[in-house]
């Protein structure tokens, strides 16, 4: 079987305390990849801001940026500079009073290949995202790029198998999850590893069930009462962990994958062949009793 290898770089950083130095850190990490043959660069969720949804505060809407913001243009230029596809998550101001948790995908020439807006919006202690973000209206549409067809989803989307399945059925070669998740300091520390394991397990399950690759890019560091657990990782179509960062790691994690493995896996593990779509109508109900 022929090969289709791509090199992926995932950036795991922490909020530095101010916008200029924070963006400068990510720019420096990305530019260090220049000339090294990377095809895809993935940034964490809301990387350009602090994790502001830890509370409800109308002033934080000022952190949102529009599509023509200089930060967007800068990262389009970086994609061109690196000759790499870039997944660029951002706090999007779509219109007055309309805000999304979004991600652009930039092509190697800096053009916009596509846009995804986060579909599932949490509202939990320290994750009050419903106050800020309108659920996305882009649906689950893979984005075709020169680095493969990307199924971009964002953070809380990772807990919903339907999103991963639809992206895969529509041809995604890789499921990509920019993320901002961690522990609250009020939680008992003995449950920390269990939560982290659940997070990795659910995405490994998506890789296995759909026989596709998964890339998760989480942020690290501590912000107020939240400590983000990092642990960005790449999983193969059989769920095997190809690369994983430590919680404390700050920098670039790299992996090379062969997109042809998806086809090979689906021949040996034909989950899509054996689906019983005639039995699945109940999945569209809120509750089945």
What does each of the following model-derived ranges do?
Residues 21-30, 160-165:
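Short, acidic/polar
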Residues 88-90, 102-105, 141, 232-234, ...:
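Short beta-strand scaffold segments in enzyme catalytic cores
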Residues 64-87, 155-252:
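CN hydrolase (nitrilase-like) catalytic-core segments centered on the catalytic cysteine
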């Amino acid at each position: 079987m022929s090969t289709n290898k791509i090199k992926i770089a995932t950036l795991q950083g922490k909020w530095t305390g101010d916008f200029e130095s924070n963006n400068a850190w990510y720019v420096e990490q990305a530019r260090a990849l220049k000339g090294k043959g990377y095809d895809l660069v993935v940034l964490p969720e809301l990387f350009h801001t602090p994790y502001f949804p830890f509370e409800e505060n109308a002033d934080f809407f000022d952190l949102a940026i529009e599509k023509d913001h200089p930060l967007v243009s800068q990262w389009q230029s970086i994609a061109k500079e690196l000759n790499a596809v870039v997944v660029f998550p951002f706090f999007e101001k779509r219109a007055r009073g309309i805000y999304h948790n979004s991600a652009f995908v930039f092509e190697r020439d800096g053009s916009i290949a596509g846009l995804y807006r986060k579909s599932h919006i949490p509202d939990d202690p320290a994750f009050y995202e419903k106050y800020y973000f309108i659920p996305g209206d882009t649906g689950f549409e893979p984005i075709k790029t020169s680095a493969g067809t990307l199924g971009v989803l964002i953070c809380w989307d990772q807990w919903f198998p339907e999103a991963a399945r639809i992206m895969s059925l529509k041809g995604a070669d890789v499921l990509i999850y920019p993320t901002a998740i961690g522990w609250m300091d009020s939680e008992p520390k003995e449950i920390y590893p269990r939560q982290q394991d659940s997070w990795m397990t659910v995405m490994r399950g998506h890789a296995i069930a759909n026989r596709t690759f998964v890339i998760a890019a989480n942020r690290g560091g501590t912000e107020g009462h939240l400590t983000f657990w990092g642990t960005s990782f790449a999983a193969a179509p059989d769920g095997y962990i190809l690369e994983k960062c430590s919680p404390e790691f700050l920098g670039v994690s790299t992996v090379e994958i062969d997109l042809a493995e998806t086809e090979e896996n689906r021949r040996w593990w034909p989950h899509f062949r054996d689906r019983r779509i005639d039995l699945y109508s109940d999945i569209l109900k809120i509750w089945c009793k």
